[in-house]
């Protein structure tokens, strides 16, 4: 059975007295190697400088520890995580709706909307809706969607070919990488 960890120690890295290795490689705050020594010696060095001993890599042989200010280190890590989160872009699915009897100008407007969506990194769902007996002309809707895919060839690749779903014909486009 695994030992029970205290709640506040679960996700914290090994620092200071929590480092339980017979020998460790110690690196100074500015990156200079201080050598291989016992953790107690490294703790004395860290205490002299009013800094913490932080385990950086336990996979190395011997494990690598750094003498640094742990509070500052933790703040920097959180700051990097926030920056990385800001730079992430989640791609949404934007929809462009039309009918198969669409006029030329209206069609061009829909294509321009789709271009804008694709340039911003979003996927596009092109939908052609049918009303009443229009569903008999699904081949015209398929031709329209293929024309749209052809017009957007520079910006998109077809993720899902035109497919009929109920009273709609749908095609998915994703931005080119």
Swiss-Prot record:
List the InterPro entries hit by this protein, alphabetically. Answer: T_IF-3_C_sf, T_IF-3_N_sf, Translation_initiation_fac3_CS, Translation_initiation_fac_3, Translation_initiation_fac_3_C, Translation_initiation_fac_3_N
Task: Identify the SUPFAM superfamilies for this entry.
Answer: Translation initiation factor IF3, C-terminal domain (SSF55200), Translation initiation factor IF3, N-terminal domain (SSF54364)
Which keywords does UniProt give here? Cytoplasm, Initiation factor, Protein biosynthesis
What's a Pfam family in this record?
IF3_C
Q: Does the keyword Ubl conjugation apply?
A: no
For this protein, what is any one GO molecular function term?
translation initiation factor activity
Q: Which domain of life is it from?
A: Bacteria
Q: Which GO terms describe its cellular component?
A: cytosol; membrane
Among the record's GO biological process terms, what is one? ribosome disassembly
Q: Where in the cell is it found?
A: Cytoplasm
Record-stated family: Belongs to the IF-3 family.
Description of how the protein assembles with itself and partners: Monomer.
The role this protein plays is: IF-3 binds to the 30S ribosomal subunit and shifts the equilibrium between 70S ribosomes and their 50S and 30S subunits in favor of the free subunits, thus enhancing the availability of 30S subunits on which protein synthesis initiation begins.
Q: What PANTHER family does the database record attribute to this sequence?
A: TRANSLATION INITIATION FACTOR IF-3, TRANSLATION INITIATION FACTOR IF-3, MITOCHONDRIAL
The molecule here is called: Translation initiation factor IF-3
- By which gene is this protein encoded? infC
């Amino acid at each position: 059975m695994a030992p029970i960890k205290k709640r506040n120690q679960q996700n914290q890295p090994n620092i200071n007295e929590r480092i339980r290795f017979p020998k460790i490689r110690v690196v100074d705050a500015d990156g200079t190697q201080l050598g291989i020594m016992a953790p107690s010696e490294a703790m004395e060095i860290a205490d002299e400088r009013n800094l913490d001993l932080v385990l950086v890599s336990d996979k190395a042989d011997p494990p690598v520890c750094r003498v640094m200010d742990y509070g500052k280190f933790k703040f920097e890590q959180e700051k990097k995580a926030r920056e990385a989160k800001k730079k992430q872009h989640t791609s949404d699915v934007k929809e462009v709706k039309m009918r198969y009897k669409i006029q030329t100008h209206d069609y061009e407007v829909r294509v321009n909307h789709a271009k804008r969506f694709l340039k911003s990194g979003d996927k596009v769902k092109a939908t052609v809706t049918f009303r009443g007996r229009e569903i008999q002309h699904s081949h015209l809707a398929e031709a329209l969607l293929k024309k749209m895919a052809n017009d957007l060839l520079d910006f998109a690749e077809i993720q899902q070919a035109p497919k009929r779903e109920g009273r709609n014909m749908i095609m998915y486009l994703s931005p080119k990488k």
